[in-house]
Amino acid sequence: PQLLQTKATYDSNKYAVIISGGGNPSVNYPRYWNDCSSIYQTLLYTYNYDSAHITVIMSDGTSSNIDRSTGDSSPLDLDGNGTNDIQFAATSNNIKTTFSNLASRLTSNDYLFIFTIDHGNYDSSGNSSLTLWNDENLYASTFAPWVNAINAKAINIVMGQCFSGGFISYFKNNPKVSISTASTKDQPSSSMSDGRYDEFVYYWTEAVTKKASSGYMVGDVNQDAFTTAHEAYDYARTHDKKNEDPQHYSSDLLSHFLALNGMRARTTSGTIAVERGETFNYSGMETINWTIPLNSPVNISIKFPTNIVYKWNCSSGNPGNFYSSSSTTASVLANSSSTSPIVITAKAD
């Protein structure tokens, strides 16, 4: 559990939607509530979200009827502070209305985090859906346009339901979306062995919440105080031991910069080391060039600090083999036989 805090101010440009459909009382397992409670507290007490900016849509909403497999009603208070946090029943109409309101409210300065959990389906036509209350199916083809209509600076989506990977393709034309899922489009997802949480979302949440001895979050590999969507996904994927294959997508390397506490800067400074022995200093968005002499084959292996993303380009000449990568490493085998030198460019993005 999180340490409850009372804050005078919150980050006004952060919004979140938490959805757990549940299906029906016989299959609405308590772990779904646990998953939602954990991420809800993380947003409030670790990342300074305003509770007024978090919409929680869960099973039968505020009803006191039995809605869980344990024969009780889901507690409405997710963080133990005495205030009800669950607002709406998990119906497609409530979800549509929530996203429509956000589309009217959010601007290009705002961030949106979307978290979904419980059951999912995969039909004979290969369509994935999120199971809502009363076993209603919300298909990816319906869900995605509601989200894509929101003009936020960036949208970070984490999905833990079965067959969640089927939602990814519907966001590939939106450069503002990063999406991580617990499984592929035709694969179930799994709970943890003790049944208290779901495997993938548990470790995703741990990546952005649990502190290592260094003082940084365990998922913050480069220790820059931003556990990015990609770092959190990678941490969850490597710790996930169940029979599921987590998936991830974002365009233009968005997930390397997007985190729950905002967007880390795309500029930095440091040193680029080259295997041949040269060292190139760079600062911010500066472009680094080096020239391969004529008729002198050179095998260059370059390794950068892991907190930077690089774009590569062979700007002139005729390399025998140029391996380009937008990750943190790249190699060049330059067999120069052209009449002009080969110039390879690495640019910190």
How would you name each of these model-derived features?
Residues 262-291, 319-322:
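Short, compositionally biased P/S/T/A/G/V-rich stretches that sit at domain boundaries
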Residues 307-327:
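Low-complexity "stalk/linker" and mucin-like segments enriched in Ser/Thr/Pro/Ala/Gly
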